């Protein structure tokens, strides 16, 4: 197992929290391997480096990075963590008993947190407990990594969405989703279809949160490109989500399916009007 850990010294730990939270950042790829999780010469990948540095700079958390779930994603080792974060692809070789423990006792009952980033939605396609937890499954990306897109923020009060303002333009690869469950999630940001060139419009969520039993789940679709990881607003957004999961900042996770329905309807109307 290659578990990368950068430990902050006791003096660096936040006084208010008593001790820093711990995050297990899983960057293993069983499908497509993104450049942002690609380790070179035994060094941390770009996304792992950013998460590790964010933890130290914020005094909020410490990160262990793994690309070996068989070794590091076990019932025994999960006891050490407050949040699990996935930037993964494919069917990860996590033992069934460890998966069951993670979904049920660790996340739902103990009230820990899960953060999925970008291709976390391109993981365990045919495994319902996973997509039921995360909220949706990768269904292609009509907008490739070079696409410049406009994103609308729907809930600027939530700490994960607040850093972005009301609307912003960014260059990144954008996923669309199947197994989408609007009745279970709160969409914080979505693709602005009126400003997007696409013949088949629909609602494309970008950032959402949900309660999962007593646990909290956040999925951030952005993060394909390495320059997104070094974007300060993106980092603040992840930090806001972490603070929300840890209960340090309030944010609403009430599902807003009516927003998804309205966005879908508006996207179709905008497209028809443009023709």
Language-model segment annotations:
Residues 48-52, 99-104, 127, 238:
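Extracytoplasmic/secreted envelope proteins and their assembly/folding machinery
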Residues 29-32, 69-72, 89-93, 114, ...:
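Solvent-exposed loop/turn segments at secondary-structure junctions
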């Amino acid at each position: 197992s290659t578990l990368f850990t950068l430990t902050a010294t006791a003096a660096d730990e936040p006084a208010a929290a008593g001790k820093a939270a711990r995050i297990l950042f899983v960057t293993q790829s069983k499908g497509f391997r993104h450049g942002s999780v690609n380790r070179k010469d035994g060094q941390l990948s770009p996304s792992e480096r950013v998460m590790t540095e964010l933890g130290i700079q914020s005094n909020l958390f410490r990160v262990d990075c793994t690309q070996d779930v068989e070794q590091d994603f076990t019932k025994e080792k999960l006891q050490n963590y407050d949040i699990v974060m996935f930037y993964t692809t494919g069917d990860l070789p996590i033992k069934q008993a460890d998966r069951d423990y993670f979904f049920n006792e660790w996340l739902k009952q103990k009230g820990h947190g899960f953060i999925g980033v970008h291709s976390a939605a391109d993981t365990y396609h045919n495994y319902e407990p996973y997509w039921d937890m995360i909220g949706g499954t990768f269904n292609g990306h009509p907008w490739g990594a070079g696409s410049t897109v406009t994103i609308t923020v729907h809930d600027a009060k939530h700490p994960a969405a607040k850093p972005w303002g009301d609307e912003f333009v960014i260059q990144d690869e954008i996923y669309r989703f199947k197994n989408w469950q609007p009745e279970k999630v709160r969409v914080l940001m979505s693709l602005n279809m009126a400003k997007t060139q696409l013949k088949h419009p629909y609602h494309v969520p970008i950032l959402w949160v949900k309660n999962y039993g007593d646990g909290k789940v956040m999925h951030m679709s952005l993060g394909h490109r390495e320059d997104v990881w070094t974007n300060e607003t993106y980092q603040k957004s992840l930090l806001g989500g972490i603070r929300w999961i840890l209960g340090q900042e309030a944010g609403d996770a009430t599902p807003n399916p009516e927003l998804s329905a309205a966005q879908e309807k508006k996207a179709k109307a905008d497209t028809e009007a443009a023709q």
